[in-house]
Curated annotation (Swiss-Prot):
Disulfide bonds: none annotated. It is found in: Cytoplasm. InterPro entries: DHBP_synth_RibB-like_a/b_dom, Sua5-like_dom, TC-AMP_synthase, TC-AMP_synthase_SUA5. Pfam families: Sua5_yciO_yrdC. This is Threonylcarbamoyl-AMP synthase. It comes from Vibrio cholerae serotype O1 (strain ATCC 39315 / El Tor Inaba N16961). The keyword RNA-binding does not apply. Transmembrane segments: none annotated. Residues 4-188 form the YrdC-like domain. GO terms for biological process: regulation of translational fidelity; tRNA threonylcarbamoyladenosine modification. Required for the formation of a threonylcarbamoyl group on adenosine at position 37 (t(6)A37) in tRNAs that read codons beginning with adenine. Catalyzes the conversion of L-threonine, HCO(3)(-)/CO(2) and ATP to give threonylcarbamoyl-AMP (TC-AMP) as the acyladenylate intermediate, with the release of diphosphate. Its EC number is 2.7.7.87. It catalyses: L-threonine + hydrogencarbonate + ATP = L-threonylcarbamoyladenylate + diphosphate + H2O.
Length: 188
């Protein structure tokens, strides 16, 4: 495992199917290429997370998320509300497109997506050219890591790269809302 300032090293690791850790608004996230099944299964094994739960996709812009979302199942008002809320630490559960891999959406016909305002996430997703998975960096039953040092202690031997940086200081993970009902699914 390497602690890197150079985002290109993280992008190279993602392209090779590796799992990385990176800072987000509130906690460090674990990420991989959402379209690489081997990488996703590796991430889920590290987290000890069942594939049925699905994972969040995090991106620099909605354009990066659009291929994973079925906009035809949303009203114009619903889509406008979602887009107006970003970038922010707000995750929306939206109808999944037919191209969204089952290992991303889990047992659901929806996909959880977020456009982050964190500068490291923005740069990383732009350099990678697509979204990353975003699940809290921690082992099952352990608290989410909020510093690079915590990531290295808890997960260092299981991930390829820790991207240097700090969280934005937000306490806890992002809020999650349903795009169709607007119901809050997880308080943020």
């Amino acid at each position: 495992m390497a602690l890197v300032e150079n985002l290109q090293q993280a992008v190279d690791a993602l392209r090779k199917g590796c799992v990385i850790a990176y800072p987000t608004e509130g906690v460090f996230g674990l990420g991989c290429d959402p379209d690489n099944q081997t990488a996703m299964l590796r991430l889920l094994a590290i987290k000890q997370r069942p594939v049925e739960k699905g994972v969040i996709l995090i991106a620099a812009s909605y354009a990066q998320l659009r291929p994973y979302v079925d906009e035809t199942q949303l009203t114009a008002e619903q889509l406008t509300q979602v887009l107006a809320s970003w970038p922010a630490p707000l995750t929306w559960v939206m109808p999944a497109s037919g191209d969204t891999p089952s290992w991303v959406r889990g047992q659901f016909d929806t996909v959880a997506v977020r456009v982050s305002d964190h500068p490291v996430v923005q740069k990383l997703c732009l350099a990678f050219g697509k979204p990353l998975t975003s699940t809290s960096a921690n082992l099952s039953g352990q608290p989410a890591c909020v510093t690079q040092q915590e990531v290295m202690v808890q997960l260092g031997n299981q991930i390829a790269v820790v991207v240097e940086g700090k969280t934005s200081g937000r306490h806890g993970p992002s809020e999650i809302r349903d795009a169709r009902s607007l119901q809050v699914l997880r308080q943020g």
